[in-house]
A protein has these predicted regions:
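Acidic, Ser/Thr-rich low-complexity segments on the non-lumenal side of membrane proteins
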Residues: 88-123
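A membrane-cytosol interface segment of integral membrane proteins
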Residues: 112-171
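N-terminal membrane-targeting/pre-transmembrane regions
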Residues: 1-42, 162-171
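Alpha-helical transmembrane segments
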Residues: 29-33, 57-62
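Hydrophobic alpha-helical transmembrane segments
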Residues: 42-55
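Hydrophobic residues embedded in beta-strands of well-ordered beta-sheets
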Residues: 81, 107-109, 165-166
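Conserved beta-hairpin
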Residues: 60-99
Length: 171
């Protein structure tokens, strides 16, 4: 979290890039295998090119997600919020926030902030555990505090429960 006069800047925890590397390595191995089969004149099952293309798209999707995570910033200011993630830049005043939905899950809370013409979402901190050992963390470490500040500054009140989730809106 970075603080400047009148603003608090938050960035999410970053997940390991190991999954991205594995996706690209398996895509490369599939392409190499496909190429070897083609060059040697052997019959290539239709599943091989499908698998190679699927792995390439998987690598691209994971890379895009990691790129966006590394550029994600949420700024809480006196006049409202700013959310950036590399692809989008959203500025929303406190008065323009019409609703905040909170959906608890095994991976932390997913918080969705709705304005008159815009929307963004973020996750509170989540820990990935394997055999009770923390293997990774993602989401905003101060996510619960960010949610509390959004609710207080925007003047929203809890409205009703939606299954396991709940939301805040103006009454």
């Amino acid at each position: 979290m970075l603080n400047t006069p009148g603003k608090q800047e938050y960035t999410p925890q970053l997940i390991s890039r190991r999954g991205e590397a594995i996706a690209w390595i398996t895509a490369l191995l599939a392409i190499i295998g496909w190429s070897i089969l083609m060059v040697s004149g052997r019959a290539v099952s239709p599943a091989v090119p499908f698998l190679a293309v699927f792995l390439i798209f998987s690598g691209m999707a994971i890379s895009l997600g990691n790129w966006m995570d590394r550029r994600t910033v949420l700024v809480i200011g006196e006049d409202g919020l700013e959310f950036r993630n590399g692809l989008r830049r959203i500025n929303i005043s406190w008065q323009d926030i019409s609703e905040v939905r909170v959906n608890p899950s095994q991976w932390g809370k997913k918080v969705q902030v709705y304005g008159q013409r815009t929307y963004f979402s973020f996750r509170t901190l989540s820990e990935v555990k394997v055999q009770n050992e923390i293997k990774g963390r993602f989401g905003f470490e101060q996510g619960d505090d960010i949610l509390r500040q959004i609710i207080l500054h925007s003047g929203l009140e809890i409205v009703e429960r939606q299954g396991e989730g709940y939301y805040y809106a103006r009454k």
